[in-house]
């Protein structure tokens, strides 16, 4: 598995939307009681093949979400989409979270749960079958889904790596 080449994507040129995946409240015990903080994991995307995620931490929920959105815009990747789905099946593990993604025929819909669904919706994938195995921690599940989308390559990428034309790729 080879990561797709990281071409510079300028998030300012994209019409990015954001989706909040998870908010977590943390507590620090101090002399006077408990001091609460928040962290938010946010997925950003243009629903046309660009997606990213960000983690924001702050003392207020809105500040954490805003920081997460800014972080997500810095981590945008390009996803190859073929006829509303992914070109091939992939299984990816991040930490203890394992995500399996399979291409589906048009009309199947987006069959995914929770955090993976948010990532795929923001990427603009309409027909896909997914299964989240192992840990259900939203942080690791989102990272596994993004990692999987990074490793997906279409026929053009395969042809470039092998220095072959598109017809040669399909013959072999």
UniProtKB/Swiss-Prot annotation:
Keywords: Ribonucleoprotein, Ribosomal protein, RNA-binding, rRNA-binding
Annotated S5 DRBM domain residues: 16-79
GO biological process: translation
Gene3D superfamilies documented for this protein: 3.30.160.20, 3.30.230.10
GO CC terms, sorted: small ribosomal subunit
Recorded coiled-coil stretches: none
Single GO MF descriptor: rRNA binding
Pfam families recorded: Ribosomal_S5, Ribosomal_S5_C
Database matches in InterPro entries: Ribosomal_Su5_D2-typ_SF, Ribosomal_uS5, Ribosomal_uS5_bac-type, Ribosomal_uS5_C, Ribosomal_uS5_N, Ribosomal_uS5_N_CS, Ribsml_uS5_D2-typ_fold_subgr
Protein task: With S4 and S12 plays an important role in translational accuracy.
PANTHER family linked: MITOCHONDRIAL RIBOSOMAL PROTEIN S5
Oligomeric form and interacting partners: Part of the 30S ribosomal subunit. Contacts proteins S4 and S8.
Protein name: Small ribosomal subunit protein uS5
